[in-house]
């Protein structure tokens, strides 16, 4: 219940909507590189909805801010988005080279957030009094999650092993921790483990019930998209597209267009298609297409998994049209981030 604790903490602080706007956006931006943009956007939008008291004038800019922050935060980390993960595992951009995208990502989020801030109502929601504490083992599981990400990076960087092996190693440690936590619900272990009366009332922890919550339909969607793109490559269409785009327009213009296409088609199939085309580009251009594909999905609510997920959290106020109204502001941040990319990356 880590995010229930976060929600309780925000409610107790008695922050106004303007401060909550920045708090939820900043937390999303910092969480996204570790937990990925979809997870961070979904969880933080739930938190924002909880503290909104149903105020639509706060929900719309806050949700858009969360989507932009999630995609921007995920663009500079190998684990922040499926697109960055694909670029990283293909060897186009190395682990530490993603840091070049940190400043462009910050600009991509800060500019639209700074403009939307003036439309956030200057009100204070009713403060909550509920007290939520971490469940037993919560802090250890948080540590294991961070350790798993570090292990996957280390396996790939130093041992030249596939990143999934580091992830599976971390999952194994989580299973062992889950076995230990199951004993909290068994009375015969209460005295041996020195549990208090409050701790004894916690339900049994079962890792398999958590795994059941994985969205396998999303995984099947990815399999279908990647198979379709592979078929286009096989029959030669990707080669024609690559020649017409990168051959005629040049790498920079083409990579900027890729970001716009990501907002319309979804960034994952677009990035996979670029990787299948494998145009001759230097590090600076691979960083650009990684940035544009990642943050370009923020232009429309359907352009990224984060945006689609957030639309499902609150359909009454936040939808395709309410997001579209702010597209020019988001586009301003998109173009500014490209300008910063030009200044900070080696050419």
Residue ranges of model-derived segments:
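Flexible loop linkers connecting adjacent transmembrane helices
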Residues: 1-14, 127, 316-322
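Hydrophobic alpha-helical hairpins/lids featuring a short glycine-rich hinge
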Residues: 3-38, 46
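Short amphipathic alpha-helical coupling elements at transmembrane boundaries
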Residues: 5-15, 50-53, 210, 242-247
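Hydrophobic alpha-helical transmembrane segments
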Residues: 18-26, 63-64, 98-103, 139-146, ...
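Membrane-interfacial helix-loop connectors
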Residues: 28-69, 73, 82-102, 230-318
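Hydrophobic core segments of alpha-helical transmembrane domains in multi-pass membrane transport
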Residues: 28-29, 106-117, 142-154, 170-178, ...
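Juxtamembrane and boundary regions of transmembrane helices in multi-pass small-molecule transporters
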Residues: 56-60, 76-77, 86-87, 93-140, ...
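Transmembrane helical segments that form the transport core of multi-pass membrane transport proteins
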Residues: 152, 156-285
């Amino acid at each position: 219940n880590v995010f229930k604790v976060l929600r309780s903490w925000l409610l107790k602080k008695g922050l106004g909507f303007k401060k909550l706007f920045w708090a939820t956006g900043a937390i999303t931006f910092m969480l996204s590189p570790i937990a990925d943009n979809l997870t961070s956007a979904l969880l933080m939008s739930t938190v924002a909805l909880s503290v909104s008291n149903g105020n639509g004038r706060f929900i719309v800019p806050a949700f858009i801010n969360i989507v932009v922050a999630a995609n921007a935060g995920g663009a500079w980390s190998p684990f922040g988005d499926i697109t960055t993960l694909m670029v990283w595992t293909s060897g186009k951009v190395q682990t530490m080279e993603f840091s070049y995208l940190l400043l462009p990502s910050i600009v991509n989020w800060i500019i639209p957030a700074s403009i939307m801030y003036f439309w956030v109502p200057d009100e204070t929601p009713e403060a909550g009094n509920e007290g939520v504490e971490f469940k037993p083992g919560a802090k250890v599981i948080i540590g294991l999650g961070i350790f798993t990400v570090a292990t996957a990076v280390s396996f790939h960087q130093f041992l030249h092993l596939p990143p999934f092996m580091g992830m599976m190693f971390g999952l194994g440690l989580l299973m062992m921790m889950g076995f230990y936590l199951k004993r909290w619900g068994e009375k015969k272990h209460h005295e041996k483990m020195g549990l208090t009366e409050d701790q004894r009332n916690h339900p049994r922890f079962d890792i398999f019930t958590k795994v059941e919550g994985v969205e396998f339909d999303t995984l099947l969607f990815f399999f279908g998209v990647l198979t379709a793109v592979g078929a286009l490559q096989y029959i030669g269409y990707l080669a024609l597209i690559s020649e017409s785009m990168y051959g005629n327009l040049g790498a920079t213009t083409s990579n900027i267009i890729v970001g716009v296409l990501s907002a319309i088609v979804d960034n994952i199939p677009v990035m996979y298609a670029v990787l299948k085309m494998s145009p001759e580009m230097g590090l600076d251009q691979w960083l650009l297409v990684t940035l544009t594909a990642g943050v370009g999905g923020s232009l429309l609510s359907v352009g990224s998994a984060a945006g689609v997920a957030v639309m499902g959290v609150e359909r009454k106020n936040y939808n395709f049209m309410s997001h579209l109204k702010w597209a020019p502001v988001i586009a301003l941040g998109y173009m500014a981030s490209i300008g910063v990319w030009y200044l900070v990356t080696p050419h």
